[in-house]
Amino acid sequence: MIQTKDIIELTDTYGANNYHPLPIVISKAEGVWVEDPEGNRYMDLLSAYSAVNQGHRHPKIINALIDQANRVTLTSRAFHSDQLGPWYEKVAKLTNKEMVLPMNTGAEAVETAIKTARRWAYDVKKVEANRAEIIVCEDNFHGRTMGAVSMSSNEEYKRGFGPMLPGIIVIPYGDLEALKAAITPNTAAFILEPIQGEAGINIPPAGFLKEALEVCKKENVLFVADEIQTGLGRTGKVFACDWDNVTPDMYILGKALGGGVFPISCVAANRDILGVFEPGSHGSTFGGNPLACAVSIAALEVLEEEKLTERSLQLGEKLVGQLKEIDNPMITEVRGKGLFIGIELNEPARPYCEQLKAAGLLCKETHENVIRIAPPLVISEEDLEWAFQKIKAVLS
């Protein structure tokens, strides 16, 4: 059997150097546990950046994949499929929106949101041609495509990729007055993460989302929530916006929408917004394919049937409380909602992630000095306690 060092050597030899993974190869996975080629087991505390909320290889989702793969996998959007309509209905009811537009990856859904907002600004709001603006927040992460990179405040993400998309206005995260000042007659949308993931589990001030939505309503600006990481139970609510009782004009969804099995993403909004598209104005050959839709329907059913949102809330509250009790001045803050938790240190976090790997836990540093804790929501209380004891030992 090929070994870890051989796989890493092949990756380093032939792969583009655009990631810096921990030195581990995962060859098997089930639930919250993964295994390397040598048979060493680790607990997954990253969940593929919250794409595996339902756990690795959930039986119901895998069965849906196999069943659909044995019938039809791809039709393109030139034809209807028997899975797309039911999936539309499922997502529309979940988001309480009238229309859904499917894509594949989160970044594609973000690009779709940008196109939607701009066309809405021109066709509905009557902004002068090519003058539409979009407001975003500092330290955001919306993906790696050109529109998403143009919205980033991280200059390293932009280096060598210019020119950037015009009409992007960046404001401090959670700053209501800055939002008010940034809005002009040309503003199409305010796009934000209700909790910033890559920024280190950055939570806005209480009430900010609600107040920001009110400002956007008053100024006729679309309030767009990127719930790719935070949605579908991760924060202890179905959507992180629910913490402020906010329903955005548009949701951007991805990651756990495919149950950690197959990529699928979408934007969801009402007809007065998504209705700006007509045939040929946007699309994707694989977007909304029957295999992805069948998997996604099963993934959403698992979230509901196994009450994973409620589980995330309960276990997350307990874990945050435990982590806050670790006595070490190196820890500057523990913050999170549900099982979306950041441990901020006053020094680089990567060495501690490597120590946690040696202890049998897989997690990843984010924003340089934050350890992100985001296990699959199916994790048992006993397994989470085991993980906490390992974290405590490393950070104490």
From Swiss-Prot:
Q: What Enzyme Commission number(s) does the record list for this chain?
A: 2.6.1.13
Q: What is its main location?
A: cytoplasm
What is a single molecular function from GO for this protein? ornithine aminotransferase activity
Q: What Pfam families does the entry give?
A: Aminotran_3 (PF00202)
Keyword set for this entry? Amino-acid biosynthesis, Aminotransferase, Cytoplasm, Proline biosynthesis, Pyridoxal phosphate, Transferase
Give the required cofactors: pyridoxal 5'-phosphate
Locations listed in the record = Cytoplasm
Q: Name one GO biological process term.
A: L-proline biosynthetic process
Q: Which reaction does it catalyse?
A: a 2-oxocarboxylate + L-ornithine = L-glutamate 5-semialdehyde + an L-alpha-amino acid
Which residues does this entry mark as bearing N6-(pyridoxal phosphate)lysine?
255
Q: Which domain of life is it from?
A: Bacteria
Q: In which pathway does it act?
A: Amino-acid biosynthesis; L-proline biosynthesis; L-glutamate 5-semialdehyde from L-ornithine: step 1/1
Q: Which InterPro entries match?
A: Aminotrans_3 (IPR005814), Aminotrans_3_PPA_site (IPR049704), Class-III_PLP-dep_AT (IPR050103), Orn_aminotrans (IPR010164), Ornith_aminotrans_bact (IPR034757), PyrdxlP-dep_Trfase (IPR015424), PyrdxlP-dep_Trfase_major (IPR015421), PyrdxlP-dep_Trfase_small (IPR015422)
GO cellular component terms listed in the entry, alphabetical order: cytoplasm
Keyword Cytoplasm in record:
yes
Tell me the function of this protein: Catalyzes the interconversion of ornithine to glutamate semialdehyde.
* Family the UniProt entry places it in: Belongs to the class-III pyridoxal-phosphate-dependent aminotransferase family. OAT subfamily.
Protein name per Swiss-Prot or TrEMBL? Ornithine aminotransferase
